[in-house]
């Protein structure tokens, strides 16, 4: 059980606003009011929420209103998050924390930051100018109202700005890193052709070029980016149809699940209004043979979803699309990085993008009297994670799915 190091707040004289029973004791400009809002109230709060996303310490496209509201509306009622928001003394929104309570029968006793099944991150949006105070106000609110042993901050970038702020807040609390891994990312600088050798995949780069030539012999190949709301609407339908034509048709294609298909249509359209989404396509004589949905926030991009025509597997259209996306991203400038949103050791993207970003799940205890319960909760959470990973490995061996 690890604890993040920090000088004791009482010794340093530093004070964070604390809310117990709704009492405001903070300075007017400090985060002082934490409250739970319904989905309807969050919808009405969309303009303030969008403004917060632009001021956020750590960007997260999956917690912006276009994505989060669409996801919450179209998931089963039992899986919908509770939205905890923090405001400062002037009423300005400084934090949005969607949470889900542990299952009373089979849960591990930890409140979780909401990670939708279609999301790759669960980093809360907090104002960069008062991030530690906002995080503390959230923890105090939960501690005063919930019986859970701790809060699980799931899927956040390791050593990212939010993670660093969390480290500064949790002195005196028990902390456990329940999971951590690295996934492929595209960092700025250099040329696309230089990435293969850096990844130790020089032969793979040569194979990509050979497959591109073979694809070009079949017809006119074009790479297109769709970013207006009208273009996104049409491209989303093409994506859903392309995805459903392949192996995902029997392993959970979005088009086969009406709620998820509606969610994707809604999220991409709403994000496009804020320049937060684009859909890229590789086309053969005008027909889409590979498509990717890319989310964007504060200079970061998220390669969220990819679909490709499996009848052209020998020409690897999915890899050709990622390679074209890589060139476009590196040539575009103003890039923080592109998150692959992939699993660790992904057999395709890892051979193209040599850089990695860390992602971690960090559990933080609530209350000094709950440490034993917190440790037990962490043990249960680890046991459940290991069981899920074992089940996934077994399923993948049985299915023997190929990646292209």
Name each model feature, range by range.
Residues 2-33, 164-194, 333-404:
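Active-site/acyl-donor-binding loops of N-acyltransferases
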Residues 31-112, 155-183, 190-314:
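A conserved beta-strand-loop-helix scaffold within acyl/acetyltransferase catalytic domains
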Residues 79-81, 146-150, 277, 333-338:
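Short, high-confidence coil segments that cap the C-terminus of an alpha-helix
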Residues 88, 127, 133-140, 254-371:
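Aromatic (often tryptophan-rich) hydrophobic motifs at membrane interfaces
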Residues 119-121, 220, 359:
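Short, solvent-exposed beta-strand edge segments and adjacent coil->beta transition regions
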Residues 139-141, 198-206, 376-384:
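Short intrinsically disordered coil segments
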Residues 143-161:
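ATP-hydrolysis module of ASCE/P-loop NTPase motor domains
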